[in-house]
Amino acid sequence: MAQRFILNGTSYHGKGAIKEIATEAVARGFKKAFVCSDPDLIKFGVTKKVLDVLDENNLAYEVYSDIKPNPTVENVKTGVQAFKDAGTDYLIAIGGGSSMDTAKAIGIIINNPEFADVVSLEGVAPTKKPAVPIIAVPTTAGTAAEVTINYVITDTSKNRKMVCVDPHDIPVVAVVDPDMMSSMPKGLTAATGMDALTHAIEGYITAGAWELSDMFHLKAIEIISKSLRGAVENTPEGREGMALGQYIAGMGFSNVGLGIVHSMAHPLGALYDTPHGVANAIILPTVMEYNAPATGEKYRDIAKAMGVKGTDDMTQEEYRKAAVDAVKKLSQDVGIPADLKDIVKEEDIPFLAQSAYDDACRPGNPRETSVEEISELYKSLI
């Protein structure tokens, strides 16, 4: 069977990489940028780092800051109109998943106006044309939206997150500069970092995993496990490691999918506005235990990649427990809560479980599941 793999056309990595934004814009003949960035990044001067590069090279732009956490259908529609009004011809997305997802949806709809309702983009979208060109500049080390073919938009009318999968939305250029991530506070660094680890682990054990994706995911697990604690303390080595590790994880999972950790996290964001990385981090160890019977020897590889010693001599039960324990220890060390007690209301579990089962990530789970089993997983976490 043929295996498809989609990546950015061009990516830049390392300190000072944002200078290459101008190089790419000029080389591609772009005229005016529609810069998507959230108000906090603008307030704290993070966005200005990119705007300075544009100004120094006399490149025109329009800044769009109506970016919300967990962007909604309405946010996207507003952005589409703003793009049209600004007379721009490409997008620069600066931020975490929210800015990236908003930019992707705007770019897709501009060139595929038949999807202007936004909701018809859910699932594998049958668009005909590539999005308006996107240059993606992440400011968090977690979502890897700069290298994925996925984006998530919230449908507030149904209290659910729509996972949209479309090869046409991948940014043409990714600029992964750790200096753009240095202002992240500890909590956000921890949450987005655990999101990246979840991508790597779920991608490694997903039903669609194969040799090429396994290579990326194992390396990502190794780098993230070594780097996240340092990144939370804002060390240069930690920041650089996380910038690379989360990108490598994105290269993998974007092409093979995820599992029910993400399926269960998405409705928490839609219903309670729970930060995505926090939800993933809390859910991950419990779902790893649940999925263990369907993972062969892969937990041995995960434990080894996370630095556990003696895995070659462990029994299956021992290395599976070691992998889960290593995830729990990392999560605890970076300050992630241990459960969902302060987030989930028990009366909401039937809705959450059904939403998780219906989520686009669920079919990738290595173990067959049901609404009832997902419900029990939620209950075990409160």
Predicted regions and their residues:
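Glycine/threonine-rich beta-strand-loop-alpha-helix active-site module
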Residues: 74-179
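An N-terminal, well-structured beta->alpha segment
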Residues: 1-64, 381
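C-terminal charged capping/lid subdomain of soluble metabolic enzymes
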Residues: 299, 309-382
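Catalytic phosphate/nucleotide-handling subdomain of diverse soluble enzymes
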Residues: 267-306
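N-terminal small/polar loop signature for handling phosphorylated ligands or for N-terminal nucleophile
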Residues: 42-115, 229-239
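Short glycine/serine/threonine-rich phosphate/pyrophosphate-binding segments
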Residues: 18-21, 43-46, 73-76, 99-103, ...
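Carboxylate- and glycine-rich phosphate/diphosphate-binding segment that chelates Mg2+/Mn2+
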Residues: 150-256
